[in-house]
Structures are given as structure tokens and as C-alpha cells.
Amino acid sequence: GKDLAQAACGAPSSGAGITLLFGGSHAGFSLDPMRSYYISTKALPKNDEITVNLTFSGTGALQTVPDTRGTPIRVHYSILEEPKADPAFVPRAADDRVGYFLETQKRLGDDAARTPFRRIIDRWDLTKGPIVFTMTSEVPRQYRAAVKRGILAWNAAFAKAGFPNAIRVDDPPSDPAFDADDITYNPIRWITQDRGSFAAATPHIADPLTGRILHATITIDGEVLRSLRRGFVDTVVAARVPAIAAQSPIANPALTSETFAAQIDPCLTGACEYSEGLVTDGAFAQLALNPRINENSAQTAKFIDEYLTATTMHEVGHALGLRHNFIAPDAYSLQEVENPNFTAKHGISASVMAYNPIDLAPLGKPQPNFFQTVLGPYDYFAIEYGYKPVSSSVDLTRIANRSTQHDLAFATDEDATGAWAIDPRVALFALSSDQIGWHAQRFQIADRLFATLDKRYPRDGRSYYDERMAFGTILNEYARSAMLTARWVGGAFTSRTH
């Protein structure tokens, strides 16, 4: 209609924020409106979807595009109907001891307050009914049960917070008019793409005035399952060592700016790379578990099933408003994460919101749970803070005060990366309170794999490509373990307690 046409007319006129993607020598790129155009538009009951092709040009042409005179970028805009005010929904104050995504508002009329900002958390309104996710027909039938388990696992935490059966998963609609782009649904989508390490993402949309979550989409990439079956990832995933970590905040105080850091560190922009790293870790685990990898074995099928459940649990946590918690693995001892009975009940970490690696047993010991497929104590704690009905801010503070318990501690993205990441316990893809001991076990597994690599490859008349990629998988594990172990030299413990 008219509103959609007016919105579309203005869409390609601005490349705000997109030029930052070029960075460095291409920072002078600007939008060329004469070579930008609309690809598609769609009007839905509560949202409009517009896809445009934006062409940027400037000095320092990119050599990786067909025509160096301009760089085309496809951009998708989603324009939502303004949510109606609901006086029954009470915004909930944020607390830096519990990890939620935030909405921040500046109070202009109170100069006596300690801070001009009011911070509230993103959360669903459960008083109107359950959160309903809709499985799309894109999700292969053989994987739907594993994905559904990962979503419904969160009901255990909501039940303790006073909302039993707070989440529901509907089967794919039979209505041919169903459109997964319609924000009245919260779809579970399945894609396949060329990047063999991307695995999942879960963006959500919240009302900036109240923090009420309006919509979420769970997107899972099926191509990563090929990487898990083979024991290597085609796309080499480098260890996450942001450029800022190599610079000194003393020499350049601007490096401590979260705004600056967000430009070079994707985790501070709300991005999640858990699934990407877990795929690489899963490929390493496949090499360690299967002397002769069989992509279609029963063990591989079980491995993939658990991977999908664990990944979905993590992504649904984001859909519920939760941020990462990278100190959660420190809650359990090395002996506990090696104990199959313990991990079956408590998991391998205190939270599914950590970047939990695969828990490989040392040689000669029984194998515990591979993945975090149960909620940890921090997950129950975080849902209690965000969703349990309370009568006053005192009740909220009382809940947050329990964060001093070891298994309820919280540390997130800005604590784990960059020049201020000084606490070695806050780590990505590490387990237990004895990280050095755990990484030593990983080095031993990698040594064993290197020693037998030539005996395993090539196989079945194939080329040496598989061996080269498997070599890269093992080498990546060496690099990651070495980097995380080195952080213990000169590190310092931090705390959010107050």
C-alpha cells in the first residue's frame, strides 16, 4: 500500500552503518544511488519486508568483486508496526550480575539520579500465554525432534519461575498462505549455505520503550552437519584474537570504548559465534572418536542429534533475552566434567549460554556427555530474575544477590575479549575450574591424532584433501588451547559483586 511505497522510496537513500563493513583503506566508500535498486517488497499484516541492492564506490577499489568500479551489497529491511502500549506489562530493571540484552533510555528530567540512563531487560510477556515457536517445513523431518527438545528444555526453568509450559512448539502449518516472514510467528528456519562453519543465529526484536520481546527467529544451517560427519570444516575458522587485544589501552584510551570495540569485535554487536566454534570443535571430536570415520554410523547420528539439541538450547536462550555467560564452565571441577553420572544430571557447564566445547574423555576413561543438553544452575537463576513475578525491586535485588554463588557467577562478551579481558576463567571453548589441566588433555588427544593421521588417510581411493583438512582441524585445536592456556600467565580474577 501507500505506507510500504513511501518506506521503500527512502530505503536505498542511506547506507548508514554499512560503509563500516569496508573499513581500513575502503573507509571512504559511499552509496551510489544511481546503481542501487529494489529487488523485492512484501507487505504483511504487521511488518513490511524490503530487499534492495546497494552499490558502493570510492577510492581503493575492492579486487574481489566482478566490477571494481562498485561493490554491490544486498540489504534486507524489516519495518514493523509500532507495538501497542500494554499498561499491564511492567518493564524489569537490569542488573549487571545477571546477563540480559538491554534497552537503554536517557532520563532528561532527573539530574539528581546517579546516572541519566535507565536500563531494562528484554523479556517476553508470559501473562498473555506461552511463547509459541513454529517449525517450518524447511527443517528436515529427521532433525525436528532434536531441535524441539532443545527448545522445550527451557520449560524446566520457567516452571520453577512460576510459568509451567511457558514455551510451545507447533508443527509446520498446513496452510499454504503461511509466511515465515510474518512476525506474528516465531519461526524455526533451516538454511544451507556455502560457509561450512556458520551454524545458527537467533535474532529477536524488542520494544525499546518496555523491553517486551515481540518476535524471534531461530535459524539453523544444515550445511554444518556435513562438517561434523567428515571431521573437518572446509572454511578454516581462525582463533578469535581480535586486533584490539594486541594493542594497549594505556597508549590509546579509546581502545576501552565499547563503541570502538564493537567495530572490530562482533560479539559486542550482539553477534553469536557459538555454533561456528562448536562445529570446528565437533570436527575435532569426530577425528578423536572415530579411527575410521563413517559419516553414516549410528554413533555419528547420535552425535549430530545431541549437537542440534545443544545448539538450539543456546540459541533459544538468546531468543528469551539472555546474553552469553563465559565464566559458567568454571563452576565444575575437572573430575566432575569427566564423570558421566555427573554430566548426565548437571551437564558439563553451569550454563548453556557459555561457549561450551565438546567434553572428550581422556584416553582410557569412560565418555561423559559430549554436549550441554541440560540446563545449568545459572540458566535457572537467570530465568528466575527475568521472569519470576515479583512485587518490588527489593525482590529482584534479593535474587541478583545470589550471584556470589560460584555456579551463578556471570561474565559476558566484553569480559572475554579485547584489552580488558584479564580474567582467564572467562574463556570461550574451555571446561572446568582447572582449565590448564583440561587443555593438557586436549594437547594429548591432538598428539595422538597427529601420530595416526597418515594411517587413516587417504581412504577409499580419495585424494589427500581430506588429510590436509583434518590436519588443519587438529592444528586449530593446538592453537586454541595454547592461546587460552597462555592467558593464565599474568591474568587477574574479576567479579561483578556489589
Report each predicted region and the residues it spans:
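Generic detector of contiguous secondary-structure segments
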Residues: 262-264, 314, 467-469
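The catalytic-center signature of Zn2+-dependent metalloproteases
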Residues: 171-193, 197, 306-362
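Conserved catalytic/binding loops enriched for acidic/polar residues
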Residues: 291, 298-303, 328-498
